[in-house]
Amino acid sequence: MTKGCFITVEGGEGAGKTSALDAIEEMLRENGLSVVRTREPGGIPIAEQIRSIILDVDHTRMDPRTEALLYAAARRQHLVEKVLPALEAGHVVLCDRFIDSSLAYQGYARGIGFEDILAINEFAIEGRYPDLTLLFRVDPDVGLSRIHRDQSREQNRLDQEALTFHQKVKEGYERIVETYPERVVEIDANQSFDQVVADAVRMIKQRLSL
């Protein structure tokens, strides 16, 4: 069976990734593709438990390196238990966040260092990078305003970080675009939701030749 395609969606808080993924998944299914939808951290029981530890609002004393290692551990288990089997079975895997989140959040915004976080995560993923990454670019103040207006959203520890932290996340993603131009495509998430989805769908169709 033909191997599948691994598509990840990245962006700062409030970029609208999760809502856009609903529309992207529907489009892919309408085109006759088998889709496995997942997220990081999470997607499987072990990783979901790690997620609850990482994002717990009461865990304010968590060391940045502890945080980075927990993300990498969740990523490894999620990759081998869910992502790789789905790809081998020929599915399109749509994942909300992957290695680039660690590079931007822990490597850049937390100040651990891009190269150190890259080393930790390359150990975890063993070279299995996404085939395509959609980076939803949104101004940090716009993104934070969105999440604070969303009454249905469960606030997590990252939501409580200062604006300066989220500005550093944005800078981290800018470096990622420069480092991996062959797989990372930028989407302007400051636009209307419909336009964001249209741009994302167009990019995916080009990559999958739909």
UniProtKB/Swiss-Prot annotation:
GO MF entries: ATP binding; dTMP kinase activity
GO biological process, one term: dUDP biosynthetic process
Catalytic activity, EC: 2.7.4.9
Cleavable signal peptide: none
Keywords from the named record: ATP-binding, Kinase, Nucleotide biosynthesis, Nucleotide-binding, Transferase
UniProt-annotated binding residues for ATP: G11, G12, E13, G14, A15, G16, K17, T18
Keyword Kinase: yes
Catalytic activity: dTMP + ATP = dTDP + ADP
Tree of life domain: Bacteria
GO cellular component: cytosol
Purpose: Phosphorylation of dTMP to form dTDP in both de novo and salvage pathways of dTTP synthesis.
Family to which this protein belongs: Belongs to the thymidylate kinase family.
The protein, known as: Thymidylate kinase
Species classification: Bacteria, Bacillati, Bacillota, Bacilli, Bacillales
The gene coding this protein: tmk
